[in-house]
Amino acid sequence: MSRRDQMVKKIKDLMYKPDYIRNIGIVAHIDHGKTTLSDNLLAAAGMISSELAGDQRFLDFDEQEQERGITIDAANVSMVHSYEDNEYLINLIDTPGHVDFGGDVTRAMRAVDGAVVVVCAVEGVMPQTETVLRQALKENVRPVLFINKVDRLINELKLDDAELQNRFVKIIAGVNKLIKNMAPEQYKTEWQVKIEDGTVAFGSAYHNWAINVPEMLKTNITFKDIIQYCNEDNQKELAQKIKIEEVILGMVVEHLPSPKVAQEYRVPKIWSGDIESVEGQGMIATDSTSPLAVMVTDVSIDKHAGEIATGRVYGGSIEKGSEIFFVGSMSKARTQQVGVYMGPERINTDSVPAGNIVAITGARGAIAGETITDADHNIAPFESLEHISEPVVTVAVEAKNTKDLPKLIEVLRQVGKEDPTLRVEINEETGEHLIAGMGELHLEVIIYRINDKGLEVETSEPIVVYRETIAGTATNVEGKSPNKHNRFYIDIEPLSDDLMNAISEGEIPEGRVKGKELAKTFQEHGLDKDEAKKVWDVYKHSIFVNKTRGIQYLDEIKELLMEGFESALDDGPLANEKAMGIKISLMDAKIHEDAVHRGPAQVLPAIRKAVYGAIMLAQPTLMEPMQKVYISVPQDYMGAATREVQNRRGQIVEMGQEGDMSTIESKVPVSEMFGFAGDIRSAAEGRCIWSTENSGFERIPRELQNKIVKEIRERKGLTPEPYGPDHYLG
């Protein structure tokens, strides 16, 4: 039997033993060494040669990733590790650290139970470390810590034993502070990482060695010895004595939970159904004979196999050739193949049981976030995947040859399916195709992928996505239907920050409100008792409240009113951008008794015009997306770096000192960030480290608003000036 066949056989055996499975992700800030670490773990599992590990970038099997040297997608791999006389199946997902690809992290975190957080010993805890850790903890994923690039502290920064330990203590305290702030209440203390219990390891992924306290006790190797090995340039020998894979995978097996342990506390958090039901109990017990429950985390298109859906099996078993049901789209499909991953290749099996990561071919029509169950069964869906950031930059895409237009539409739909953080808008009337992404790099990669599918495209300059809101209030605004037989009266005011945050954090889910289920939550966030029971709709960070009493026929047009409210917010009156942060209350209504006179053609324009008119009466305001920008530069370049930020309308939030480096934390509008990479490099002569994180929307300075509104309207082919309230209400 070849080594590969042995490996396949082991993976197939271990799939059925949930106590011996670990589903883990590796998360970190960009360039802190995630993919290098993954490669080493694979080398150990006999997947790639150990000589090449570190340079191989095995999980980066997309050309773009190898070329840019960063991870763009989350890649899946399964491997077998022996620990204390038992073999374990470790399913590993490598995730991107670049802010533009945060959506992949969110999806990967839904599939795993534990995470190895990699932090660079030189840079310490960085903004993106915080973002990825927050995503992990939000999904109830337990962390352990690996401090990487320790050799650089010794060889480049020349730190001695005591200084090393100080640096480590500081990094660990930083990570634990984040865990304490962001972990679920019951795990704030239990999940803290500690040197003494082995939940923290140190090492160099590039040079293949790592150590933690249990390993020190086993090998008698101390930090003094490590400093000596590094100083004598003898890290190869060190890597033979303290093998990185033994330490990291040992830590994973010892401290991160098996599906059996994790599903008990994770399922209630990520699944919206009744935990006491048959399928609820099946998932909690990781029971492979209970009803099927799969959460799709990723869909990719393979040249040979077509659409491949990757997901986590939480309950039951998914079988080859079986009929399955998509809960979200209410449609059915038949699986062609099911299997697990080994590196980028899939190993097909007859079935994949609960607790595993599955690859399904033939699941046509699946999208990331979909829930799959047996064809003759319907279960409640998994909670939708919350992305921490929203798309903020848009480009228009055109096919170079007109004959390629149908292909362009097809390719855009494919790309949108593969990457749910991308918003693809295909406007068939204007013929405009827009893609909105997380930033400049995200869109560059998507365009490269479109070209890669054999399609030549031209793109516009990147355009920033704005939002509309209000700064004032308006009361008793009347909207009339075209036939004048229906009238609606609304009040409008800005939504409180407290409610906005609750919606952003996912405490209040977006969507039409059924009954009084959220009344208590609305009350906790500032609505009075009566109002809290009357919220009809939460949409794009705005809410629609029905404050009327005893209006005849209102229930019959309730759905139409919500549709009108939603479509008005989809493109606001100021610049046709989406509106947010608005509370609209329906105060009174006069509705025609004859159903013919109160159909969609009458109700929709009436409510839309009322909303538009009210917005224009309540000091309409444009909001722009902001990014936090973190810069670390030598002191001599501090002034130049600060000027670079201030020239872009940036505000300096905080400045600090780390050894001989200065740190600057600032907030800059996304519209001013194009070309920043080149400018900051030349300002600091290449000697700076910088990173960004999306930071929501803020109001545009008054003096710029008219100019920007005019530019947006002209770009969209609208009249240069927005219409006044009378246009909508007259």
Curated annotation (Swiss-Prot):
Main location: cytoplasm
Keyword Nucleotide-binding: yes
Subcellular location per the Swiss-Prot or TrEMBL entry: Cytoplasm
Gene3D superfamilies assigned: 3.30.230.10, 3.30.70.240, Elongation Factor G (Translational Gtpase), domain 3 (3.30.70.870), P-loop containing nucleotide triphosphate hydrolases (3.40.50.300), Translation factors (2.40.30.10)
Residues spanning the signal sequence: none
Keyword Translocase: no
Free-text function comment from the UniProt entry: Catalyzes the GTP-dependent ribosomal translocation step during translation elongation. During this step, the ribosome changes from the pre-translocational (PRE) to the post-translocational (POST) state as the newly formed A-site-bound peptidyl-tRNA and P-site-bound deacylated tRNA move to the P and E sites, respectively. Catalyzes the coordinated movement of the two tRNA molecules, the mRNA and conformational changes in the ribosome.
Protein name: Elongation factor 2
Species of origin: Methanosphaera stadtmanae (strain ATCC 43021 / DSM 3091 / JCM 11832 / MCB-3)
